C-alpha cells in the first residue's frame, strides 16, 4: 500500500476510490466564509501522462474559493477533503459514501482556518488530521 503525501500528519492511508478530480467544485464545510472550493491540484500525487490527479477523503488539495468572502477569493489555499459522494470500500467490507462533496480550508500544517465544521466527516480524514477531528461534530 502506498502512502499519499500529507503535510504534517502521521499514520497510514489505505487505498480509496478517488472521487474528486482536478477541476471539481466541492462545498466548503467550515465557517471561514467560503461557500465553494475549486480543486486545482492534489498534494502528493505523482501521476501518469494524461491522467487527471484525483482526491479522496483525507487528501490535502490546493483549491481556490469560487463563492464566498472577497478576502478569500482569488487566492490558492490548501484544503482537506472531508466528504465525497463516490462510494469507497472500507477494510471491514462496508461501502461508504456521503450525500455531498465537501472540504475544509487549512494551513499547510493541517490546522483549520475556521473553528467549526458543518455536517459529518469521514473516519479516514479524522484519523489523519487530528485538528479537523476535534472540530467535527460527527465522525462517520
From Swiss-Prot:
PROSITE patterns: RIBOSOMAL_L14. Keywords: Ribonucleoprotein, Ribosomal protein. The keyword Ribosomal protein applies. SUPFAM superfamilies: Ribosomal protein L14. GO terms for cellular component: cytosol; cytosolic large ribosomal subunit; endoplasmic reticulum; extracellular region; nucleolus. It holds the Pfam family Ribosomal_L14. CDD domains: Ribosomal_uL14 (cd00337). One of its GO terms (biological process) is translation. It comes from the Eukaryota. GO terms for molecular function: mRNA binding; structural constituent of ribosome. PANTHER family: 50S/60S RIBOSOMAL PROTEIN L14/L23 (PTHR11761), LARGE RIBOSOMAL SUBUNIT PROTEIN UL14 (PTHR11761:SF8). Belongs to the universal ribosomal protein uL14 family. This is Large ribosomal subunit protein uL14x/uL14z/uL14y. The lineage of its organism: Eukaryota, Viridiplantae, Streptophyta, Embryophyta, Tracheophyta. The gene is RPL23A.
